[in-house]
Amino acid sequence: ADLGYGPATPAAPAAGYTPATPAAPAGADAAGKATTEEQKLIEKINAGFKAALAGAGVQPADKYRTFVATFGPASNKAFAEGLSGEPKGAAESSSKAALTSKLDAAYKLAYKTAEGATPEAKYDAYVATLSEALRIIAGTLEVHAVKPAAEEVKVIPAGELQVIEKVDAAFKVAATAANAAPANDKFTVFEAAFNDEIKASTGGAYESYKFIPALEAAVKQAYAATVATAPEVKYTVFETALKKAITAMSEAQKAAKPAAAATATATAAVGAATGAATAATGGYKV
């Protein structure tokens, strides 16, 4: 008989998979270790996954049972430790609940995918499905590395850069609203909240995210990424894709500010030098 369903537990893709080393997430300390409770939980689950994967080097027919037998207890322990502390406030409590819900959905989806498979294929189907879902969830916590901003966003006009911070804030508000909505309503709730927040933060100057071409393209790309996705993780895929795009835009903005300042300083210096040279030769300045 199959092992019964338990709390959310991550896994790995099938053959040939090598676990990626998590990058230092936003909010990590100097040593690159996670600092938020959610990031700490994901790190513990990743550690348990690696141990279970290493221990699954058995006959194909026994891989699934061996993996779950090792990973289940490690995962449950991580959850017990991660959720045992008293939340520091409503925000942290809500964040933990959202993460737990996503992990739970990921586990159920992987378990369902493996139903009916032959013993040899059961392990591959289970870990491949759950690994992809967990990769997406980890992405929302910025646990894994993302591409440099230059690779994500080629060029963002100066006018657009000025509002990226407001867009980022609007995204967070919309994501919070969507996380509290029923699964079938998450897309609608997110887009409505996203647009409302952008309109409010710009004093009504803009009605929606579509005033930024690069952002509109990112939203369309994020929606496209969900086409072949199971309903249980559909919104999570969208949220991750859009978050990645906005993060890249934000990083590009940070890089653009010092560059613009340096250019302005250089221009002023050249102007001053030119003026001084003109005056020295008895000429004039406009």
Swiss-Prot record:
It is found in: Secreted. Residues 1-35 are annotated as: Disordered. Keywords: Allergen, Secreted. GO terms for cellular component: extracellular region. The keyword Chaperone does not apply. Pfam families: Pollen_allerg_2 (PF01620). SUPFAM superfamilies: Group V grass pollen allergen (SSF81736). The keyword Secreted applies. Coiled coil: none annotated. It comes from the Eukaryota. Residues 1-34 have a biased composition (Low complexity). Belongs to the Poa p IX/Phl p VI allergen family. This is Pollen allergen Phl p 5a. It comes from Phleum pratense. The lineage of its organism: Eukaryota, Viridiplantae, Streptophyta, Embryophyta, Tracheophyta.
